[in-house]
């Protein structure tokens, strides 16, 4: 499911930003963001209750098709929180084969390198919800565990024919205050400015990093939302300035 959650101001030529869901499959966090000055679309996981395994590559191909149905050609930005940042990276790789769409940048919002080798049965991407029907909580928690398995099998894309889009990491400034082993996994690379990516996946996966307020699970809380909103506005504007003009490529 793709949903437009913000519209660009009249007269603006800002490129659209597509944000991918976290491991729960939901996009509710993005609704808290302040105005970003561009069209913003959020993609939720419409198959959260579906049975069977799906690779991140397969899921990303579905999302590529969704975006193409919205923007057939031109320049776009991709991003997301946690799992959403990794999905953005994979979808960007798919778009590198598309001559009609240019990805100007990838925005990873506190998306730590997915090293869950020692905690596949524990590593939840976000805390289980205490709200809503028990069946809904069960579906979400199952989806989170499936995500950990999916990331364990994921082969991080390598750009060979085209350069990787400019990729920026927004890093939460605080650790999660929890004794839960699963929750602490999001902080295992907190000392790295790229949250473990450049040390473990290659020296140029993440080009820049910016600090934001809060810990992994409080980024979108009211007290922190201005920090992440302002940083996203700054980063996405810079990405557009660095991107080649459409008519130079097409």
From Swiss-Prot:
It comes from Fusarium pseudograminearum (strain CS3096) (Wheat and barley crown-rot fungus). Keywords: Hydrolase. GO terms for biological process: biosynthetic process. Pathway: Secondary metabolite biosynthesis. It is an enzyme of class 3 (hydrolase). The lineage of its organism: Eukaryota, Fungi, Dikarya, Ascomycota, Pezizomycotina. Thioesterase; part of the gene cluster that mediates the biosynthesis of the lipopeptides W493 A and B. W493 A and B consist of six amino acid residues D-allo-thr, L-Ala, D-Ala, L-Gln, D-Tyr, and L-Val/L-Ile linked to a 3-hydroxy-4-methyltetradecanoic acid polyketide chain. The biosynthesis starts with formation of the linear polyketide chain by the highly reducing polyketide synthase PKS40. The gene cluster contains a putative acyl-CoA ligase (FPSE_09184) for formation of a CoA thioester polyketide. It comes from the Eukaryota. This is Thioesterase FPSE_09186. Belongs to the AMT4 thioesterase family. GO terms for molecular function: hydrolase activity. Its EC number is 3.1.-.-.
